[in-house]
């Protein structure tokens, strides 16, 4: 039942996945759509990241709180999800009483890329915003920026 996806490097993009060593970096991907989740995980694994997933904001919050401090290095958070949406989950993570709750980068992933959506993501405590469908080049840029 897997989805095979082929990726092409854009012409002129001479960066390759081996540019930066992300081994040991752990990412939590929060996405309720199975196909979008699989695509995101494939992209992130191509870059050498260790990935875990959650199907909604409530599960993401539960995983974050159950993990030791500093366990996750980055969170990619879908916005529109059942049970608890991405905005609610980001606010709940930021409100947690542990040191990594304030500093972990949370990146909104959504099909809505309007400026109002970006503002709402930032207001909810997210650090940045990336639109679906993913472009590997943009994903690499965001990861480089937040996993320095």
Predicted regions and their residues:
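C-terminal catalytic ATP-binding subdomain
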Residues: 1-15, 47, 137-148
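Helix N-cap/capping motif at the beta->alpha junctions
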Residues: 32, 53-65, 86-89
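Charged docking surfaces used in two-component/phosphorelay signaling
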Residues: 38-46
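Active-site beta3 strand of CheY-like receiver
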Residues: 70-76
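Active-site residues of response regulator receiver
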Residues: 78, 110
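Receiver (REC) domain active-site loop signature in two-component systems and cognate sites
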Residues: 81-84, 126
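Alpha4 helix (beta4-alpha4-beta5 surface) of REC/receiver domains from two-component response regulators
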Residues: 88, 102, 113-128, 141
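A Lys-centered signature of the CheY-like receiver
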Residues: 132
């Amino acid at each position: 039942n897997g989805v095979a996806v082929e990726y092409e490097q854009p012409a002129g993009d001479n960066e390759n996945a081996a540019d930066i060593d992300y081994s040991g970096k752990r990412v939590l991907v929060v996405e309720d759509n199975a196909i979008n989740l699989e695509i995101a995980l494939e992209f992130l694994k191509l870059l050498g990241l260790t990935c875990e997933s959650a199907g909604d904001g409530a599960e993401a919050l539960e995983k974050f709180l159950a993990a030791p401090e500093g366990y996750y290095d980055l969170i990619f958070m879908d916005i529109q999800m059942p049970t608890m949406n991405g905005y609610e989950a980001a606010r709940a993570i930021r409100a947690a009483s542990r040191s990594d709750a304030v500093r972990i980068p949370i990146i909104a992933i959504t099909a809505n890329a309007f400026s109002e959506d970006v503002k709402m993501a930032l207001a909810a405590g997210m650090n940045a915003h990336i639109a679906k469908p993913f472009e590997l080049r943009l994903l690499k840029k965001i990861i480089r920026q937040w996993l320095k």
